[in-house]
Amino acid sequence: NSSYRIISIGRGALGGDVYLGKSPNSDAPCPDGVFRYNSDVGPSGTPVRFIPLSTNIFEDQLLNIQFNIPTVKLCVSYTIWKVGNLNAYFRTMLLETGGTIGQADNSYFKIVKSSKIGYNLLSCPFTSIICLRCPEDQFCAKVGVVIQNGKRRLALVNENPLDVLFQEV
């Protein structure tokens, strides 16, 4: 299974790779936040792997995202992306780690073509359990960026989703 870096298409302060970092005020024993570096001239991002429900990775299908890094046993679950609970300050949900692979929960995402350039990430709760006849994307939310303690944190947004490309590592 290949690893990729998720790279923001923007340049300068609008650019920057996605990485695993420590969430402010978190008491988790491992890094547990999904962030984007503040500039495209910053360090390289943390590699990820995409784990599809089926055998291959395609656009617009449910998948899990996992930071693909060596880690101690205690921190393995802190590599799998999920959407956290509502953050009152930001009035949205922040992306964090601690998700589960293959479970019907808040750990499912999709990669879709951006309306501008590149791709967007969507958070998509596993909807077949919620609503058997609903269009699948009805429950999906766009992933963008909020500023948390000077860091760019990935979060669910209504506007300005993060436009990204994927670089195989």
From Swiss-Prot:
Key words of the record: Aspartic protease inhibitor, Disulfide bond, Glycoprotein, Protease inhibitor, Serine protease inhibitor, Vacuole
Site keyed Reactive bond for chymotrypsin: positions: 93-94
Upregulating conditions: By jasmonate.
Disulfide bonds: 30-75, 124-134
Domain of life: Eukaryota
InterPro entries: Kunitz_inhibitor_STI-like_sf (IPR011065), Prot_inh_Kunz-lg (IPR002160)
Cellular localization per UniProt: Vacuole
Glycoprotein recorded as keyword: yes
Glycosylation sites (chain numbering): 1
Coiled coil (residue ranges): none
GO cellular component annotations of the record: vacuole
Keyword Protein biosynthesis: no
Reactive bond for trypsin, annotated site positions: 49-50
Similarity section: Belongs to the protease inhibitor I3 (leguminous Kunitz-type inhibitor) family.
Function: Inhibitor of cathepsin D (aspartic protease). May also inhibit trypsin and chymotrypsin (serine proteases). Protects the plant by inhibiting proteases of invading organisms.
Name of the protein in its database record: Aspartic protease inhibitor 3
Lineage: Eukaryota, Viridiplantae, Streptophyta, Embryophyta, Tracheophyta
